């Protein structure tokens, strides 16, 4: 009997919607919540275990199943749960993928099943109201210390602002929603709730690093920023549908890591730098947590004269790392050295993705304004 029940549960995985994790979309889920009636992956099952008042989990393959539990799974399933628990997810709300950090997945799961934010829209006020203020820990630009700072997000002004003192009349910085991006970077920032916010200042990218001790708070900030971007883009591109706008709300970096670089004459020694590939901007920093990039390189499309090559030009000297990459732009060549072959492969793939993609009209404007820094 036990074997038959387990086989019955396994057969339910073949039903439409059940072949991927109900929460992050990972293929071939091996776990199930027998109180919610959903099939989930191993990673998400760990989060479900932390909300036992809502969800109780079992291994599809290894645990014993009772008849009533099998029947419950059969009468529910991922599609039914989605129809109930995700019926009112705002278009701008970030839905995590298998590669996202633990925090995003945990808050998505808690929002769905524990707080039921997508059944009762009034619970979405913290990120849907168009205005948000509160205190966040912000990393100091020069000393690297995290200090509590007041942040204000106002859609009416199209800006995120922060203040150095509680009683300050003027903000220390005003970040325009138009050019703002936010991406979770727990490992780099050294905090599980670490968020990196970038914006353009004088056409150069400025980084700020923030976190909040409460996971819900920082994810609410993240989704409030996405909501502000969504509403800004709806006005800027009135003909565009949600499907066109949602991918533009926030970007994860295509690739980050250390490479060596040399200057424009290619006679100087190579220096180790931290590189971030953000859409078509390749930025390099002395330290991963620097506020400003030392330089930025725009990577356009092959139609505009950009090429990526494996290796160095002949007679290149001064690099400590053996695996070379050459980026050819209409102005000059940029040389980079990677420590490992797999690093080189990943960087070339990231660059190639940008080069193979035709440029949008607004990207030509960015290219024209771009400062090619040595």
Curated annotation (Swiss-Prot):
UniProt xrefs under SMART domains: ArfGap, PH
Phosphothreonine carried by residues: 276
Subcellular location: Nucleus; Cytoplasm
Modification N6-acetyllysine, positions: 272
Domain PH residues, every copy: 129-230, 252-356
Phosphoserine: residues bearing it: 87
Any one GO BP annotation for this protein: cell surface receptor signaling pathway
Keywords carried by this UniProt record: Acetylation, Cytoplasm, GTPase activation, Metal-binding, Nucleus, Phosphoprotein, Repeat, Zinc, Zinc-finger
Start and end residues, zinc fingers (C4-type): 21-44
GO molecular function per UniProt: GTPase activator activity; inositol 1,3,4,5 tetrakisphosphate binding; phosphatidylinositol bisphosphate binding; phosphatidylinositol-3,4,5-trisphosphate binding; zinc ion binding
Pfam families to which the protein is assigned, alphabetical: ArfGap, PH
Post-translational modification: Phosphorylated by PRKCA, PRKCI, PRKCZ and PRKD1 in vitro.
One GO CC term on file: intracellular membrane-bounded organelle
Keyword Zinc-finger: yes
Expression tissues: Expressed at highest levels in brain and at lower levels in peripheral blood leukocytes.
Domain Arf-GAP positions: 7-126
Subunit structure: Interacts with PRKCA, PRKCI and PRKCZ. Interacts with the N-terminal region of PRKD1.
Primary role: GTPase-activating protein for the ADP ribosylation factor family. Binds phosphatidylinositol 3,4,5-trisphosphate (PtdInsP3) and inositol 1,3,4,5-tetrakisphosphate (InsP4). Regulates the incorporation of CD63 and CD9 into multivesicular bodies.
Protein name: Arf-GAP with dual PH domain-containing protein 1
Naturally occurring in which organism (per UniProt): Homo sapiens
Originating gene: ADAP1
């Amino acid at each position: 009997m036990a074997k038959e029940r387990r086989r019955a549960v396994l057969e339910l995985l073949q039903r439409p919607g059940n072949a991927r994790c109900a929460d992050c979309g990972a293929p071939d889920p091996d776990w199930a919540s027998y109180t919610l009636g959903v099939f989930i992956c191993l990673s998400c099952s760990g989060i479900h275990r932390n909300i036992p008042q809502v969800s109780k989990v079992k291994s599809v393959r290894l645990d014993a199943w009772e008849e009533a539990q099998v029947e419950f799974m059969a009468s529910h399933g991922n599609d039914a749960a989605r129809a109930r628990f995700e019926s009112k997810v705002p278009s701008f709300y970030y839905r995590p993928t298998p590669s996202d950090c633990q925090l995003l997945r945990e808050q998505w799961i808690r929002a769905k099943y524990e707080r039921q934010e997508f059944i009762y829209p009034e619970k979405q006020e913290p990120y849907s109201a168009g205005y948000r203020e509160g205190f966040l820990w912000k990393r100091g630009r020069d000393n690297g210390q995290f200090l509590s700072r007041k942040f204000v997000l106002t859609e009416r002004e199209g800006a995120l602002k922060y203040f150095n003192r509680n009683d300050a009349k003027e903000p220390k910085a005003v970040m325009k929603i138009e050019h703002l991006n936010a991406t979770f970077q727990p490992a780099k920032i050294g905090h599980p709730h670490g968020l990196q916010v970038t914006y353009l200042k004088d056409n150069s990218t400025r980084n700020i690093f923030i976190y909040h001790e409460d996971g819900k708070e920082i994810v609410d900030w993240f989704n409030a920023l996405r909501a502000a971007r969504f509403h800004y883009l709806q006005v800027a591109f009135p003909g565009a549908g949600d499907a066109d706008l949602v991918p533009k709300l926030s970007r994860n970096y295509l690739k980050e890591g250390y490479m060596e670089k040399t200057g424009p004459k290619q006679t100087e020694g190579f220096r180790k730098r931290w590189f971030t590939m953000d859409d078509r901007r390749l930025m390099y920093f002395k330290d991963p947590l620097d506020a400003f990039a030392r330089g930025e390189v725009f990577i356009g499309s092959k139609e505009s004269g950009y090429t990526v090559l494996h290796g160095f030009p002949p007679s290149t000297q001064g690099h400590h790392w053996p695996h070379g990459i050459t980026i050819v732009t209409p102005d000059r060549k940029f040389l980079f050295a990677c420590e490992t072959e797999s690093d080189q492969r990943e960087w070339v793939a990231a660059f190639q993705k940008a080069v193979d993609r035709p440029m949008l009209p607004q990207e030509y404007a960015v290219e024209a304004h771009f400062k090619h820094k040595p």
